[in-house]
Amino acid sequence: MPKLNRCAIAIFTILSAISSPTLLANINEPSGEAADIISQVADSHAIKYYNAADWQAEDNALPSLAELRDLVINQQKRVLVDFSQISDAEGQAEMQAQFRKAYGVGFANQFIVITEHKGELLFTPFDQAEEVDPQLLEAPRTARLLARSGFASPAPANSETNTLPHVAFYISVNRAISDEECTFNNSWLWKNEKGSRPFCKDANISLIYRVNLERSLQYGIVGSATPDAKIVRISLDDDSTGAGIHLNDQLGYRQFGASYTTLDAYFREWSTDAIAQDYRFVFNASNNKAQILKTFPVDNINEKFERKEVSGFELGVTGGVEVSGDGPKAKLEARASYTQSRWLTYNTQDYRIERNAKNAQAVSFTWNRQQYATAESLLNRSTDALWVNTYPVDVNRISPLSYASFVPKMDVIYKASATETGSTDFIIDSSVNIRPIYNGAYKHYYVVGAHQSYHGFEDTPRRRITKSASFTVDWDHPVFTGGRPVNLQLASFNNRCIQVDAQGRLAANTCDSQQSAQSFIYDQLGRYVSASNTKLCLDGEALDALQPCNQNLTQRWEWRKGTDELTNVYSGESLGHDKQTGELGLYASSNDAVSLRTITAYTDVFNAQESSPILGYTQGKMNQQRVGQDHRLYVRAGAAIDALGSASDLLVGGNGGSLSSVDLSGVKSITATSGDFQYGGQQLVALTFTYQDGRQQTVGSKAYVTNAHEDRFDLPAAAKITQLKIWSDDWLVKGVQFDLN
C-alpha cells in the first residue's frame, strides 16, 4: 500500500458539538468502495459502519456526540461514515450539513473515518478508497486490553474547559512527497547527458494545527473591553505542531564531469540534495463573515531570531457558578475575563519570517531563506589548482532546519459578528519550495598554466509542494452563544424533562443530561434557546412547539426569586405542566391538576469536566485510562516513577521498580516532585497523596533529583478521581493528569 495523502481532522470536543438524541442505529452492511476498504482490515469486528443514506430516514438519525465518543474512545471502535450511497448531490449535501451540525465541523467528502487519537476523536475525510490507509481502521492494542479489563475511558478535559465554553479539535495535515516530485536533473550544465535522480529521501509534510471555536462576551470598560464576537483560533504552537516538514535526513552530493575535452570552460559539477528555499503557510476564510482579528507573529521576524513567545488573547466569559450564585438560573452575561495563551518557540536560524495580509480574510507566513540563500554563498573556496578535486560546498552552512523536520509556529485568530449566521470554510495551505543545489568548477586555461574557479548556479528549478486542509464552521453552533446548556425538569414527575423533537415539537421525556434535545441556553435576553437548533426558542404563546427566536416578550422568562417558578415576562404567568400528561401551559396559580414547579440544572452535552494541572512533563506518548471500580492507581517505582496504570496489566512506562498501588478514595491533595534526575533528563520522580484523615503515601523517590520543583493539586470537596492521562516513554513516566467527576 503506497504512502497516501490525507487530511485528518482531530476533534477533542471540550464543549461537545450538539446532535440528535437517537441512540446508535443498526446500519446496513457496507457496499461499494466501503466494502473494499473494510475487506483490507484484518479485524473488521473493530469497525462500525454507517451508511449516511439511512440517516435520511427520520427515525434513524445520527448518533449524538456523546454516543460517538463512547463508541470510539471508550469501546475503541473505528467508525466509517459513507456518504457515497446517497445518489443525488442535494441529498448528500444535506446529510453533510447534518453531520456538521452534529459534531461541530463538516467536510464535503464521500467518506469519513473516525478514530481515537490521544484520547480524542480524529476525523479523516477522503473521497476514494485508495486515499486511505486501511491500517487506520485496525484496532489498537490498547483496545484489546481495555476490552479484556472492562475499563472505559471517557473523553478528557482541558484546563480551559472549566472557564471557557469552547469546541477544540486538531487538523492533522499529512502528505507524502513522492520521489517523482523531488526528482531533478543530476547536472545543471549537462542536463541531457547525466540523467536525473530524487533529491529527497522519505520527504513529507506532517503538521498538526490546533483549532478552537469559542465565544467572547463583551466585558470591561470601554477601550479595554473584551470583544463581543464569535472566535475561530488556528494555532501551530508548542503543544501541537506535528513531526514537521521533512526533505532529507542529511545532505549528500554527486559529482559529474564533462564528457568532452575542455580548455576554457566548465569541466566539473556537483549537485547537492534538496533544501527548502522557503516554507509558506496561508490561512484563508471563504467569505467576509470572518475577519482576521489578531495574528502572531504580528510582523516580520529576522533570521537568527531565537525566543519563546506567548500569544495571549483575552475573552469575556460567563465565569460559571463560581461567579454567579444563581447557577443554572443565571442569564448569559460576561462576569469575568479569561486569557487564553499559546506558547510559540522560535529559532529562525537561516530564515526570515515574512507576514503578508492580503485582505481581512487571508494572511500568509513565509519562512524565506536569508542566510546562505544562494548556491554561490555556500562555497568554502573560490579557486584551486587544476589537479585539486574536492567538494567545494560547506554543507555546515546549511542548518538542519532547511531540510529536516522543520516545525513552524504561528497563531491566527478570526472573529465573526456575535449575530453572524450561516457558515464559513477555513482553508489552510502548507507548502515547501524545494530546490536542489548546483555548483560547478570552471577551467581557466592561459597557455602557460591553468587553474579552476568555483561557482554556484541560481537559475535552477524550484518546485513547490502544497498540502491543503479545510474545515467548515457553522456560526449557528451553540458553542458560539458562550453559555452552558441547562435543562427544564417537570417537578411533579420523578424524572421528566422538556424535550424537543426534529420538528421542534415539545414533550416530556426521561431526563438525560447528555441529550442536546433537552438542553437550552438561557441567553442575555432571558430566552431559552434550543441547543439542538439555536434559531428556535421557548415561546409562551405556543408551548406545544419551539418558535423562531425573536424579540417578543412572550419568549422572555424570569425566575421568581426564592422559588422554582419560571414566569413569562409578557403575561406574568408561570410555566406550568399537567401532572398527568406533562403538557405545558401558562398559569396564574397551581391546582390539583397543574404544577408550577420547574427544576433547572446544567447538562453535560458540552462535557465540562474538571482536571488537575499536568503534573510533570508532557513528553513521550500520552495514554488515557479510566479508574477501575477498585479506585486504585497501580505504580511501578524506585528511584523515580517507572510506570502507572489503572490496573496491574495496564501499566504504561518502563519495566523497572517494584509494584504497588495507591487508594484514590478520600484523596485531599496530590503533590508532584520533578526536576533533574541523577540518571538523566528532567523527570517526574515522586507523587505524594494526602488523604482527608491526614495519612500520606509517596510513590517514587526524592533522593535522586536536583533542582527539585513541587506542584500541588487540591481536590475539591467530594470530588473523585475518575480518569488518568499518563505521559511516558519506554523508561519512565514523564507526567500525569487526574480527571475528576
Curated annotation (Swiss-Prot):
Membrane-topology descriptor: Multi-pass membrane protein
Any GO molecular function: toxin activity
Positions of region (Beta-prism domain): 607-741
Induction comment from the UniProt entry of this chain: By hemolysin B cytoplasmic protein.
Disulfide bridge partners, by residue number: 182-200, 497-511, 537-549
Site (Susceptible to proteolytic cleavage): 144-145, 148-149
Keyword Signal: yes
Domain Ricin B-type lectin, chain residue ranges per copy: 484-575
Annotated function: Bacterial hemolysin that causes cytolysis by forming heptameric pores in target host membranes.
Family: Belongs to the HlyA hemolysin family.
Quaternary context: Monomer. Homoheptamer. After binding to target membranes the protein assembles into a heptameric pre-pore complex. Proteolytic cleavage triggers a conformation change that is required for membrane insertion and pore formation.
Name of the molecule in the record: Hemolysin
Native source species: Vibrio cholerae serotype O1 (strain ATCC 39315 / El Tor Inaba N16961)
Gene: hlyA
